[in-house]
Amino acid sequence: MLGWVRKRFCSDLAIDLGTTSTQIGLPGEGIRIDEPSVVAVPRGSHRVVGRGAAVGKLAYQMLGRTPEGITAVRPLRHGVISDFELCETMLRYFIRKACGQTMGLRPRVIIAVPGCITPVERRAVFNSAERAGAGRVWLIEESKAAGIGAGLPVSEPLASMICDIGGGTTEVAVLSLADIVASQSIRTAGDTMDDAIVRYLRRRYSLRIGEQTAEQLKIAIGSAAPLDHELTHEVSGLDTASGIPRK
C-alpha cells in the first residue's frame, strides 16, 4: 500500500548534477529533465529573475548576453558546488519540474558525484538536495553510474573501463563485481576545452566569442581521435579592437 502511495504522489529520481547540465531520470520513463546548470540573478543578489523561472534553458540563453544588472551564474564549478544557495534553488526548480503535479511526498533521490570530491563537498551536495525538497538521498560515483547506464557488465567478474568526460570533471575507472577497482578523476573537462577555444580565437584571430559559441564549435568539429581530413566551421563574434561583429 505504501509503495502505491509513493508511486502515486512522488517519484524516485536519479540526478546527474553536472557543471554544464543537469539531468533527472525517472524509473521506467528515462530522462525527463535535461537542462543547463545555469541560474540568472540580479548582480549581487541570489533572487532568481523572471519570478524564479530563469533557471536552466532560459538562463542559459542569457550566458554572455545578459542585460546590464543581470548575470547568468553556474552554481557548480569542476563538478562541485560553488554557490550553495543558488544550487539549492536550481535543484528545487528541477525536482519540482520533474515531479510535476504528482509531487506530494518528498522524492527519494540518488545523485551522481565526481570521484575526486572531498567529504565536505559530498556533504554539501547531500545537504543541498535535502534542502531542495528531496527525502532520502544517496550519492553514487559518476563513473559507476555511467558504467551502469552504458550497459557494461559491471556486476560480472570482468574488467570494464569507462571514460566519462563531463563539463567540469573527467572520470576514468575500471569496474568489476559491482565496484570500482581503480579510478582517476581530474578537474579538466569540457569547460576547459571551451575556454581554450575562446582564448585561441581571441589570440589567433582577434575574435571574441561567448561560451555557447565555443561549445557549438567544439561539438561541430571536435574529435576524440585523429581525422582523415580537418573539419572547418564558420564562427561569428566581435572584433577585439573595434567591437564590430564579424566572422
Indicate residue ranges for each PLM-predicted region.
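Nucleotide/phosphate-binding catalytic cleft detector across ATP-hydrolyzing
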Residues: 1-165, 173-247
